[in-house]
Every structure is written in structure tokens, then in C-alpha cells.
Amino acid sequence: MTSNITELNKWIEGYVNPQSEESVKTNAINMVLLYMKSNKIDLQDVVQGLGDYLKSNDSILRARGTLLLSEVLCRLPDLPLNQDQVHFLAMFYCDRLQDYACSSEVVKGITGLITNHTPDYPDNQKLLRNIFSEVHPTSLTQAHRKMVLQVIDIMFNKCLSEIQELKNDFMVGYLQFIDNEKDPRNLIFSFKLLPKVIYNIPEHKHFLESLFEIISCYFPISFNPKGNDPNSITKDDLSNSLLNCFSCTPLLAEHSIPFLIDKICSNLIETKIEALQTLVYCCDRYGGFAVQPFLEEIWSTLRTLILTHKNTTVIEESKKTIFYLTRSFTKERKVLESFLSIMIKECLHHIKSSQDSKIAIYCASILYQSVSASLLSSKIILIHIFPNLFNFLSELQKQDTVQKVNEQNSVIALFNDLLKANSIAFEMYSNENKEPNPLEPFVDQLFKLFSDLLLLNSSSSIRSNSIECLSNLYISKKVHTTEQDDDDSEQITNEFLLDLEKRQFIIKSLVSLLNSSDNTLRHKSLDSLFTIASNEDPSVLNLYVIPTLLQMINHSSCNINTTNNKINNNNNNNNIVIKNNKCQDEHCNEDHSNKNENNNNSNENSNGNSTSGSDDDLKHYLEAFTKLCTHQPLLESVIPQIQVLLQHNIKETYQSNEDFEKSILILQSISFILEKSTNIKSMTICSKSILFPLIKGLYKQELISSSNDNNNNNNNNSNRFNQILTPTLKMIHSIFENISIESQKPLLEKLIKLFLNGDTLVINYQLPTTTTTIIKPFEKSSPYKYLIPIFTTIISQSKLDLSENNELKQSLYQMSLDVNVDDSIAISCSKAYSSIINKQQQQQQQDQINFNFFNDNLLKVINDTTTPLPLKIRHLDLFTWCTKALLTNGNSINIKLGSCLADIISNENVELSYHASKSFGILLSETDVLNEKSGSIIKILFEQKFFTLMFPILLESFKVSKNKELQTISSHYLIAISNLLKHVPKEILLAELNEILPIVMQSLKSSDNNDQVQLLDSSLQTLTMLINETPSSFISYLDSLIPSLIKISTKSTKYNLKRSALEILTLLSKSIPFVNLFPYKTQVVTDIIPCLDDKKRIVRREAQKCRNSWYILQK
């Protein structure tokens, strides 16, 4: 024991002695702590050892001695101390606080004592009193000032009642310690502590003014943290903590609100914005009654900002402030009514007296924000505003309508804004209080007003605004309360404010405007119908809108056919085409007798314009039908009508070219509708009701075009079939892509029978007696090969594994290599074949698909010098798509196949080499097949993996061909590389920057002939991205880059290349330092002058921007 004491004294001497080295001090304190931890010495031993030092006349020795004791208390949280020892230490520190030289060390000791132990009453009070009375905050370092705050915080948690007994003394001492604090670490702690003080010390109300003076000096927070410290305190941290201080008690409202209003009037935009946001937060926390005395002052300030300020950000923030304040005041109705009464009175005054002015528009926006804030605010405002607006509009209508159109429009626009705002409020808050819609008392008056304006007013702008008002009134709902039968509880159901009759009137009025000569009215009507369709039950629209549109579409079609027949027959006997009052179109039952009587005399004069007019009508109706049917619930209900449209427009014969063009327009519209739908339910219905009739119609078309003996007619029919095929393939693609694998399976089984076995009964089609052969499109001599894309589209979108169907695979394989079919057919077969390969099971794929398969069947033919070029191209296309299939599903041979594709680029045949280089664009690009929607297997990051392994191979081949001076081959390798660069993420490009930049720079020197356009375009795109990401990397290339870009912008024959080059020059002027660009300034400004006279406006505009940017270059 004696030896331990001896060692202890030695360590105390080493620690306390100011002459000791830091290593000695560190070792000494560590050994003291170690011995105490192992119970070889105790606290009493340490105190006795420190006795002489604590009594020393040397302030440094006293401080070091005190620090040693404090370190022990802080660093040994589990140190066993009884209450006598705790009391002794508390009294020791109370006494030692009078020693100014030891204040920091004592504060640390008190922190350790309070944190790890609990002194008895009233030791905590004595410690805190002595800290407040003896310690001056300015004498402490940041860390020790924070310790004082931590001591207060701990005492609040451990002995709150003792702290509360201090009353005013605590508040005086606490304010002393937080005043004039500047360190952000202490500030954030004091800000977080303040609400706790407010909540727990009732005497704070006597010190509110002093308290607010202390915290308000920090607003707004201006603090920039160190950028290299991720754990540093941020400006937002300080701002949020200060915000909680401002709002911690309603008693601060009398100080904070005038202060914030003063800050809102600041000249600094940032200060205004932050003050507005703080005002909203504080008012919400204070409650309406605390804010009520300041309502007029708040409104006056916000009104001034909105009506007079020039900065849009400030104006929008002020509007948001009104919205949130109104929502907050909803909790106290009297306060809300007081606030809104001030606002309504002034807004109405400006609206009536300042019509067609910016002030009136801003007042309308203020009302919009207030109405949308809550259901109660909407009710209060609408009750006061609507009667005034009705009277005011009536007065305007009695005056000269021509001069007052703008004023009327402003009032109608305000009606519309209020309807929208009320809908927002009702949708957000109606279910909370089960209150009726505030519009309910005015609904009949509003309906009559807007209906009369639409039907009776001659102003297009007023009618347009009234259309939007009617649609917003239409979708406004009410809350209908009914009782449930089981437990008598109330059930809330939403119903429209307008009854069905009024809603049907609006629908009919809007439909009647769909063919208006006024584009604004037509588009506004269509948009309003779509808005209604998004809210209304589809059955209501199916009562009138859809049947009417379909009737109009068919009627427009009939007009086209009728007009053409009249033109054709007019020179013969001037017979009228309508017989028995029925249209000659076999699919139309329209009665045209009235039209015939009225228009018979005018046909001779109007024949030249009627066709184009009917064509425009048809486009307008189709536009409406298409937009409405993109709404999913409505689409499901109109699928039968779409089926009828398809049957009527994929006909065996067309009466004229105009009739055919009309059918194409309808098919394109249906195609657009189905493309926009991704709903499985809707597409499943389409697959059952539309798919097979659609294919049947296409079969009939192809049968007609293939069986016609007349060459001219045959070519015409073939062209028509191809035009029909384009939109119908998109329909088939959309349907099959969006149905489940369970729905696909039975359909595929039937379609394989149809296309491979010629079983047309699958589509319920009996071949004509004149057809002696079975329709098998995949037979070598079949004249029906144009049907193949239908089948390949389906196979490509199939989610099933079809790899076991060898007949299917062989048919696709052979057709993809057939040089006697169109390229589009062969490519579609290659896509379908690759899709099957992609979806094979991995083990089966390894067994059936290996490198030898491709080498023996495709590569040998491609590399054989005796093979005709068209056949090589076919094999190369199939090889490319198969490579893409195996690349996307992560097959291990994909890199080997890619290397073979790269080798083909070095082929002596220039056309084959160029085709191979373009193939690299297919490998990584997004296509309509081999994607996730089609059920393909897509491995994660396959693009990055392929680029990482393939780029070095292509780069090395490019260097070899360049060294051998094979200019054409090297340019083809550049095309392949550029195609890779175009489709990989920028992170990958940046990682290979040193290798990529020389390649891109080399590519810019290519000519813009047909073979090189793709290379230049891709290189310019890559260049733009790289300059945006790492502009400094191009400084060393400026001497070659800038002349190359100038040459492209002035000499290229492709306007898109010119524009891209000019955009890059502009980008360089903004991204590269002035000192590097200045030597080229004159060259750029002078040499791009020819672009200012370019025949393309887009080039001229970009040249002007580029020249201006370079002309004003400055340091």
C-alpha cells in the first residue's frame, strides 16, 4: 500500500508540475486512473496527495491540482462514491469557485460530479448559485462555457424542483451565461436549452424582454460551416433551434411579431424570406389569440409586399404566408374572421376599382390562397365575395360590353380561381368535420351565370373562361351524410353538387364546341372534358360523350366518301349520291336527308373545300376521343366501341384515297390510346376482344394485296397494307406487352398455330374459295410474308420461355437470313429470335447456345469471302441481336461475341465493316424488345461491364488500324467506340477520361458524309457531357478543339451538327478560365460570322448566342 502511495505522489508531481513534458503528464494521469480503476488507490488518497498543491500560493499549481481531481471525476463514471464523499466534493468545488485562476478546472469537475453522481439537496442549488455568482462567462473557454450549460441541462433532468426554487436568481444567472455567446457549438446548445427553461421556470415571464433581446440579435442566422467537416453544425441546425426559441411561448408574441415584421421590411431578399417563414411558424405555435392584436399590421405588411414588390420569389413567399396563416387561424374562428374581414374588404375594393390591373390580379391570388387554406376560410370568404361579384358582373354587363370585356374576363377568372381553391380546401378537409361544400348555397346561381356566358356571350375569351368555370363547377362535390343500417353510424359519401341533368348539359355544350373554328374554345372544351372524365363515372360519359364522338367520327368519314363520290359523278349526270336517305358507306347508318336538301344547291361551289373541312372535323373529333380514352376507367368502358372502329376501318376495300387516309387517322388514334395504357386489366380485355379481330382484318388486307393480278393495284394495296400495319403493330405491341404471362400463354398457343400451321380458324377466318393454298407466311414461297411482323411483335413481347419450340425458332432463324424478304421483316425475325434466346433458362442456354453455334452458323458465313454481301449483312444483323440478347441476360460468352463483332470491322469489305461498326449502337441502346416490360432477363449494370471489357479491345484495334494507315477502318472503329460512349453512364466515361478524350478529339476531324454523320453526332454529344463534368480536362486540347468546332459549325452540311458545335463553343466560353480562352477569342468571334447568315434559324440563333458569349469574355 505504501508503494502505491509513493507511486501516486510521483504521478501527481509529474502531472501537476508545469515543467513536465506532455508525455509525462499523459502517462501520469493514465496511471492514476488505472490504479483507481483497479482499487489500488481511492479518491481519498488522491485528495490527500493533492493537498499541498491545492493550498499552494502558485495559481498554476492550484489549477493543475484541481484539474487532476476533475479529470478523475469525468473519466471514471463508475467511480464508487458515497453521499458523504459527493457532498464533500460539492462543497469543495463551491469553495474553489471563488478561486478565479481555477474556474475552468472547477467547472469541469462539477460537470463530472453532476453527470456521474447525484448530490443531495441543497448541494445542487449551492453549486449553481456559486457558478452564477463567482464565474464570469468571458473568463471561460468555449468548452467550459458549454459545460456550464450542460450542468444546467443535467440539473433540469435530475433535480428540477431544486432549480425551480431558485426562481428569479436562476433566470438572472442563466441569461448572464447565454448573453453575447458567439460560438455555434454553444449557441445551438443554449437554443435547445431555452425552451426547457421557459417550460419549467414560471418566473421567465418577468424576463421576456431581456430574453428576447438576447436571442433576437442572432436572427437571421448568418453562418458558413467548414466544408470539410461532415459533422459540423450547419446553418439550418442553428436556424431551426433559434426558431424553436422564438416560438416556445405565446408570451413572446408581443416582442417577436413586431420584430419579424420589421425584418420582413428589410432590403435583403434572404432576410425577407426567412422572416416570412419564421412568422408563419411562430403564429402557428402561439395560437390565434396571441396574434390577434397584430392582425392588421401583419396584413398590411403582406399586402404591401404582394402588391408592390418586384421580386417574384418574395411575392410567392408572401402568398404562401397568407395561406399558412389562414390555415393556422382556422383553429380560432373569431381570429380567422377578423383576419379575413380585413383582407376581403381591401381585396374587393381593389378588384372593383382597379379592374384589368396588376393589383386586381394579385388581390385575386390572395383570395385564392385564403380560400384554399381551409374549409372554414373558404366558407367565410365565399359568403362575402360571391354576392359582391355577382352584382359587380351584372353591372359590367349592363354597360358597353365591348369596352368592358377585359373587366368581365377578370371577374370570371376570379370566379374560376375561387372554384379551384374551394375544391382544394374541400378535398383536403371535408372528411375531417363532415361539413358541406361552401359552394352549395351558390351552385344554381353559378351554373346559370356560366351557362349564359357560354351560350349567349359573343366574346371568345369570355366563353373560354366560362368553359373552365363550368368544368370546375362540374367536378365540385358535396358531402352527403347517410346512416348505416348495422350500427347507426354516419357514412360519408361524395356526390357532385350539380344534378345529372345539369352535368349532362355541360357535357353536351362542351362536345358541341369540339369542332369549333376557334382553336382556343376547342382546346379549352377538350381539356375540360378530360378534367370531367377524370372525376366522373365512365357510365355518365358513355351516355352521351362517347356515342356522340363516335357518331361524329363516322359522320365525318361519310362526308369524305360522299364528297368524293359527288365529285366523281358530277360530270356525268349530276346524280345525288345519297340513296334512300342513307350514306353509301357500308358501316354508317347516318340519315343525311336534311343535309342533302339544305346543301344540294351549294355542292357545286363547295366541293373543293368540303373534303378538307371534313378531314379537319375528323381530326378534331379523333383528338377528343383519343384524349378522353387515355383516362383508364373510361378506356375499359369503350373497348367495345374501339373494336367496332377497328372493324370499320380495316376494310377489304376503300372507296377512295381519302377514305383510306381517314381510316389511317382513326387507327393512329387507337394506337395512341393503347400505347398510353399500361393497365393490365384494360389490356387483358383488349387481348380478348380486340387482338384476334385485329389480326383477322390484317389477314384479309394481306390476302387482297397479295392476290391482285394488276401490278399497279397490287403495289397500291401493298403500300396501303404497310401503312395500316404501322399503327396496328403498335396496338398489338401495347396489348401483349401489358398482359400477364397467364393471359399470354393461351394466346401464344393459338397464334403459333395460325402463323406456323396456317390454321386461320384460330381467328375465326374462313379462307375465300378463290384461295387454294393455306396461308403460311414462313414458307419460302409464301406471298404473305408481310404478315410476319405481326407474329414477331407478339413473340418479342412474350414473357414465356419459348426455347423448346424448335419449329418456331427454326422458322424465325431462316426468315431472318432470307435475302429475298424486306429488311424490316428480316430484322423483326432477328429481334424475335434473340428475344427467345434471352429468356431461355440458364442451364438450357448453356447446353444449346455456345460459341460454336454462332461460329459455325453465322461467323463462318460472314467471314467467307465467297458469300454475297446481302447474305453477310443478314447474318451480321442476326449475330448482333443474338449478342445483345446474351449481353443483357449476362451470358458469359457475350464478350467473346462482342470481340468477334469488333473483328468484323476490320473486314476488307467497307460496307460490311461500316455495318458492323453501327451494330455497336444496337448492343447498349434501349429498344422495343429485350427490355423489362417484354419480360426479358436484364442483368444489373450490364452496360458498364460490357463497356469496361469491350472498350480496350476497340481502342487497341483502332490504334492498330491507325498505325497501318487504314483510314476507313480506323474511322469505323471510331464509330463503334462512339456508339459505346453514347450509351454508358457518365461515371464510367469519367473513369476512362484519359483514353476517351483523344478518341473524341480524333472523331471531330471526320467529314460529315453519310458514313461519318453518326460518328460526329455521337462525338459532339459525348463532348458536351464531358465539358459539363470536367471542363479543366480540355484546356490542353483547346488548340485543336476550337478550330475543329469552328470548321463543323461553318462547313458542315448538317444543321444539327452545326448547332451542336456552336453550343459546345458557347459552353467552353462559360466553363474554361479566361486566361486559357483569351488567345482564341478573336478567332471564334470572326470565324463563326458565316453562321449568322445560315439558312436555318436555329443555327443563326445559336451562332448569335455563341458570338455574344465569346465577345464579352472577361476575367
From Swiss-Prot:
HEAT repeats lie at residues 944-986, 990-1032, 1035-1075, 1078-1115. It comes from the Eukaryota. It comes from Dictyostelium discoideum (Social amoeba). Belongs to the MET18/MMS19 family. The gene is mms19. Residues 596-613 have a biased composition (Low complexity). Residues 587-615 are annotated as: Disordered. One of its GO terms (cellular component) is nucleus. This is MMS19 nucleotide excision repair protein homolog. It is found in: Nucleus; Cytoplasm.
